[in-house]
Every structure is written in C-alpha cells, then in structure tokens.
C-alpha cells in the first residue's frame, strides 16, 4: 500500500490504490471499492474537497464507517480525524498516516468529542440521515457540527437520500433490501441549516443510476474502464431530465 500524498496522485490513481487494498485485504470491509463503477460514486466528493478545502486543513470524517473517506483525506494531505460509534479494521493502515480517531458512546448519541472551533471542515458521507436510528436527531447533530467548526468552516454532506429517489422507492418494496428510513428534499435541507445557523452554499441532486449492484459481477465487467465510463456518462446525462428522481442530495454549508 502506497503512503504517498494525493498532491501528486490523480483521483483515478487513488481509486485504483484503494481498490487494490480492498482486493488484497478484503477483511477491511471496503465493499464500495469492489468494483470500478461503485468506486466512482465518490469522485464528485473528492473534487468538492479539493476545490473547497485547502491542503493541511483540519477535517473531520464524521461517522467514518469503514474509513475509506478518511483514507482519501489523509492521502490528500489533510490533517484528518475520524469519529464513529464503532472501531474498524482499516484503522491500522490509517494510523500509519498520522490518523486521529475518537470513538463515541451510544449513551451520548448527540455528542461529538472535540473542542469548539476545531475543524476547517466536517464531512458526512451517508451519516446525517441515520442519527435518529441511534437516539439522536439531525438538529442536535448539526448544532454539534456548528460548534466544532471554525468560523467560516464548511460542512459537506454527501449521500443524503432524496425523498423522491426511484432507487429508494423500489428498494423499500423488496423484503430485506437495504433502503433509508429517512429521506429529504431541498426544503428540508434549507430548514435544517437555518435552524442550526449554517449558511447554505450549494445544494444539488445526483446519482440517477445505481452503483453498488456492480460489486458482485465478474471482474471483467465490473472493473472494465469502458463500461465504467459509459455508466458515468449515462448517469451524468440522465440526471438532467430525471433530477427529481435521483438517489441523493449533496449540500455544502458554512459556519
């Protein structure tokens, strides 16, 4: 595993790197990187970070899950912290890159254990919509995020499920199929930010085509660059006429 920083590493090379880690160490649970098509769902997020947040900034991967986004942040040269209610296998690799990790307690579901005005950015990758499932709520979580952000710091929320997503609607009808209990629209996003004093900078829908379904296909299909490019282009085209039915929102807000 390379420990070079992303300053000299294009996003495509980073994706290849983390896919190789998943292939070599499958117990790390980096399931999103079992196929090139599914791995590409994060390219837009990587670009947002590189465009909005300067190198060496302090960034929190809030609800870091299996640690895949923390790995990107570290490779990109950010001072990276992670927070989760559970530890994860991949952390032993992240620790080689000066990673700070704090574990939360389920009896304090709303608390983020960092001091006021600590971070230049806090990122949620598919986390904010789950806080009610662990005894919290969106407003209290956003108030905590506001507290730990530096003045002018950014909250970047990615993979925030769209209320009218066709994928979510179908998934909810299939027994034992994963879907999100809580989904949102633009008005709800603005309301959440207004109630927590966060200034909305950008809101957009994305992701009309499914991605994770590719993970269990043969390697010759799921990791084919031509197929991946066709899928990416199709997804980009379809998001315009079918934006309302896209799977997710992303929004960027500032303290």
What is each residue range found by the language model?
Residues 65-69, 86-88, 128-129, 162-164, ...:
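Short, solvent-exposed loop/turn segments at secondary-structure junctions
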Residues 1-115, 121-125, 142, 246-249:
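Conserved N-terminal segment of class I S-adenosyl-L-methionine
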Residues 121-136:
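A short SAM/SAH-binding and catalytic strip from SAM-dependent methyltransferases
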Residues 58, 152-154:
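Short glycine-centered segments of the SAM/dcSAM-binding site in methyltransferase folds
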